[in-house]
Amino acid sequence: MKKATIYDVAREAGVSLATVSRVINGSSVVREKTKEKVMKVIDELNFKPNQIARGLATNKTTTIAIIFPQSLFAHVKDMIGGIGDAGRTLDYNITIYTTDDIGNGPMDDVMEKVIRTRADGVILFNNDNIDQQIELVKKHSIPAVVIGMQVSDESIGSVYVDAQKITYDIVNNYLEKGKNDIIFVSPQQNLIRTVDLIEGMKKAYQDHQLPFDESTQVINTSTHYEESYTQFVEHFRNHKHDLVFASYDKEGVAVVNAAVDNNISIPDDMEVMAMMDTSYSLICRPSLSTIHLPIYDMGALAVRLLTKILNQEELETKEVCVGYTNIYRKSTIQ
């Protein structure tokens, strides 16, 4: 038997779609006689209301918009999987919008599309342009959750990792072994997460009463593998370090390959670690040691947090900090 829809109920009951939705939502504005008629048809058709049917009366579209830079896709695709699965479980539609690149996308145009499609809420990814994005969603009073950075704002939720703790613990471990020549590699120097990673590194050096020179120990690189690889082929002709820590797996792979092509043995001559733990870390030779972030879970948590905000559910906090795991493979000595 064909599954009944809200259109079938409205037609059989002789009422509008909005009236059916109001009955489903228990609205008091519907006359008792009309309510009884609609409920009778719902029972006869065995109609099971979904979020869209409920949303017609509440002016909700049950749609969540995701906005992220195209160049981050390799790092966030698993996160999008978590967002999609959580959205389906909670009967929300997910619409994806991409900006051209980190910090360079037409954010005003994207936000105009989000507003035009009447998305109930927005999930943003931490990027160089995040401050502008947050201001835009606040300006238009769109509920939002940011993934990848802590946001202390009553109107914005966030799902993040403690980036300072990650680098502090890693760097502190190497400094305790007497391995002081450590550099940090990232394509996003202005990113709040990157700033936090650098701060954690600085603190470890300070606690060991060792000098930290940001001008030489923090290296800005490209988001494109080929450019990063070329940059480090040149760098390793004159430099070798105890540890290179990269903010993303892709940059970590570029470092490993450039080092090997300069006859630097990984991990005997130099160790390499990166963050995220995507498939890049497994196809690298030697395999790349990483900080595993629960990417899929972060996406699912962001959806759950956003839906609670949308439904005005009571929340202990809008700032959700998730854990991480150190995964040691062949690019480090452990």
Regions picked out by a protein language model, each given a short descriptive name:
Residues 1, 5, 59-172, 176:
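Alpha-helical recognition/docking segments in bacterial nutrient-uptake
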Residues 17-19, 56-72, 181-188:
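Short beta-strand segments enriched in small/hydrophobic residues
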Residues 1-61, 333:
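N-terminal helix-turn-helix DNA-binding module of bacterial transcription factors
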Residues 180-181, 212-216, 266-271:
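Short acidic capping loops at alpha-helix termini that bridge into adjacent secondary structure
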Residues 68-78, 97-105, 159-169, 185-231, ...:
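Hinge/beta->alpha junction and helix N-cap segments in small-molecule ligand-binding domains
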Residues 233-334:
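Flexible loop/turn connectors
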Residues 65-67, 118-126, 183-186, 237-251, ...:
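Periplasmic-binding protein-like
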